[in-house]
A protein has these predicted regions:
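Intrinsically disordered, low-complexity terminal regions
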Residues: 1-316
């Protein structure tokens, strides 16, 4: 027993030393002039990735790991920077982090990042198109400025974006929370099979949010129209400006809370199989088993609100 404990302790100590050594000095350094690179393609198996800004004219890559032979491969071909994991090696005990420093305000044509079991952190990035996916790992981004399309997905891990500006946004996680600070876009589609969706500020023409199991909370909404749905979870939407086109909210099992600006002109069509509608604007409280339609002020775009089992609240 003592021998087993000693062996386990020795293994943990060895891994700890390896961790410390992996973080101290890079095992590989590469640099490229910024005009050499128009695209970035990164594909990692287990290495973590950090992308940071630098105030120079070079793109710098540093690799920190506890086994030089297993370090990812770095190369530049046809104006594309490639960083990729080596294949067919044992990942147990292997610790690695790739740091990429990009010149401030450099815009790329396309950035594609894939991680199997990798945490990915991005401070600032400018690109025409952007694709980011992890199978098992967290995604954290501070500022993304994407001219066209942005796709951000994770199979099992959280997605946390402070600010993103893009034309079309698609974000999805199978199991994990999705959080956005500020979104500025034309259209956004955000889905989670099992996890909450939180957005602090949304500006765009249209958004669609859906979660199978988890709450949806969106604040400071400025949009023309939207679709929101949840199978099992509460939906709370807080509008900065009222909608201008038909929109829909639907949940199978969960409350719906809607907050609109005072004196807004719009219509609602509300129904609930088992629940109460609290209309705090007109002071009504009812159980709308069939569709209940109400016009506010001059009337306007219709917001359809449906729940199978849950209360509905509307207030300004």
């Amino acid at each position: 027993m003592i021998k087993k404990l000693f062996t386990a302790s020795l293994l943990l100590t060895t891994l700890s030393i390896s961790t410390l050594s992996a973080q101290s000095t890079p095992v590989n350094n590469e640099s490229f002039l910024k005009n050499q690179i128009s695209n970035i393609e990164i594909k990692l198996i287990c290495e973590d990735l950090e992308i940071k800004e630098t105030y120079g004219d070079e793109i710098l890559i540093e690799v920190y790991c506890n086994n030089r032979k297993k370090a990812p491969v770095i190369e530049c071909k046809n104006e594309t920077l490639y960083i990729s994991s080596k294949v067919n090696f044992t990942v147990f005990g292997f610790i690695c982090k790739v740091k990429v420093y990009l010149p401030a305000n450099q815009k790329f044509s396309n950035v594609k990042i894939e991680g199997t079991s990798s945490d990915i952190s991005i401070d600032s990035l400018y690109s025409e198109d952007f694709y980011l996916d992890t199978t098992s790992g967290e995604i954290e981004c501070t500022n993304l400025s994407i001219e066209n399309n942005s796709i951000i997905t994770s199979t099992s891990g959280e997605i946390d974006i402070e600010e993103i500006s893009t034309k079309e946004l698609t974000s999805k996680t199978t199991s994990g929370e999705i959080s956005f600070g500020k979104i500025s876009c034309d259209t956004a589609t955000i889905t989670s099979n099992s996890g909450e969706i939180n957005i602090d500020d949304f500006y765009g023409e249209y958004f669609k949010v859906n979660t199978t199991s988890g709450e949806i909370d969106i604040y400071n909404i400025d949009t023309e129209y939207f679709t929101a749905g949840s199978t099992s979870g509460q939906i709370s939407l807080d509008f900065k400006n009222i909608i201008s086109a038909k929109s829909q909210i639907k949940t199978t099992s969960g409350e719906i809370n809607i907050f609109v600006p005072k004196n807004s002109s719009f219509n609602v069509a509300v129904s609930s199989s088992s629940g109460t509608f609290k209309d705090k604007i007109s002071g009504n409280r009812l159980t709308p088993r069939s569709e209940y339609i109400q016009k506010y002020n001059e009337g306007g775009a219709q917001m359809t609100i449906r729940t199978t089992s849950g209360n509905i609240s509307l207030e300004d």
